[in-house]
């Protein structure tokens, strides 16, 4: 019982003003019993409440289809994964699996997540550039009220389904950008929703803010392409790459 008491005491000492009551308590699904049941019992005896409003029990991480554990010697540190693959692809890989399900970490799954992140940033960068070049102010993050996306998050934090809503919006945005006559209001709507979804998921979409120099470089770059001056367009493209636009 000492282990369970330690957790209750720590929570009570930090959240005493809330009567030792927290909104979300997380942990691996193997802690559901007896640890979390004992925490609840002790907290209820002490404060008269069940300690937490929501309990989230996550699945284990499997490395190449084996449970990650010290005994198997296959432990991978998060800092090493982020250093090698990047934080955003790793986040997307995690979000693409429901938190209660086992998470399979393989070169294939992280590789797919890297490709997915590239698709997201490619679309989001293109959207932000097109809108700015049209003289349209980029909408600020406001907390989306798009029902379908947040319904999925409210449904036991169903991040895989929430990602599906995001990808549907990205598909619509790419289709709108390919139109000969672009509906700029529709495109602005695509941008705003994608930006809200990414913000809610904690994903950096790689938004580009164009300064006056970048706007002028873009104009010269497109003029050079139209004139089929490929040598000049390559030089200008290189400058845009240096500014993080391409």
Which residues does each predicted region cover?
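Alpha-helical recognition segments enriched in aromatics with Gly/Pro capping
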Residues: 1-127
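Structural preference for alpha-helix termini/caps and helix-kink/transition segments
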Residues: 67-69, 74-246
């Amino acid at each position: 019982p000492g282990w369970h008491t330690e957790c209750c005491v720590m929570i009570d000492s930090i959240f005493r003003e809330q009567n030792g009551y927290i909104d979300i308590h997380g942990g691996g699904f193997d802690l559901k019993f007896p640890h979390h049941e004992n925490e609840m019992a002790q907290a209820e005896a002490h404060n008269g409440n069940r300690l937490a409003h929501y309990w989230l029990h996550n699945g284990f991480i499997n490395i190449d289809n084996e449970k990650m554990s010290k005994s198997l010697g296959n432990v991978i540190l998060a800092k090493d994964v982020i250093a090698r693959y990047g934080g955003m692809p790793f986040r997307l890989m995690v979000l693409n699996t429901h938190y209660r399900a086992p998470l399979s970490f393989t070169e294939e799954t992280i590789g797919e997540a890297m490709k997915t992140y590239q698709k997201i940033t490619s679309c989001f960068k293109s959207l932000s550039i097109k809108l700015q070049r049209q003289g349209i102010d980029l909408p600020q993050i406001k907390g989306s009220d798009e029902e379908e996306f947040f319904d999925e998050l409210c449904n036991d934090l169903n991040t895989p389904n929430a990602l599906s809503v995001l990808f549907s919006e990205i598909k619509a945005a790419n289709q709108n950008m390919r139109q000969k006559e672009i509906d700029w209001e529709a495109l602005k709507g695509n941008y705003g929703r994608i930006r809200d979804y990414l913000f809610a998921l904690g994903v950096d979409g790689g938004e580009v803010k164009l300064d006056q120099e970048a706007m002028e470089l873009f104009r010269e770059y497109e003029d050079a392409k139209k004139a089929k001056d490929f040598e000049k367009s390559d030089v200008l493209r290189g400058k845009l790459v240096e500014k993080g636009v391409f």
